[in-house]
Amino acid sequence: MMELLWTPEAVRDREDIYDYIEEDNPLAALAIDDLIAERTAVLQDFPRMGRGGRVPDTFELVVHSSYMVVYDIVETQVRILNIVHTARQWPPLEE
């Protein structure tokens, strides 16, 4: 079993998603957060479950029709890098 590590950026993304949804529907915010937790936990046993990412050396896992988790694998760790809304440009355009 791989270790699951959340980067500070991914934690911030998750909190932002929760806060945004909670404004209109607290129960939906809990449901989405639980879904993100459940789907990412599966990566501990199946780390290559996601498709190859658009950023080199990453993977992408759609956890909900609106959200995708970007992660990489480093030795015995699955590192959650970002959670991205599927309607957003990913990777972001460089300025």
Model-derived features with residue positions:
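Enriched for short, Lys/Arg-rich terminal
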Residues: Y67-M68, D72-E95
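Basic, Lys/Arg-enriched alpha-helical interface segments
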Residues: M1-T58, V74, L93-E95
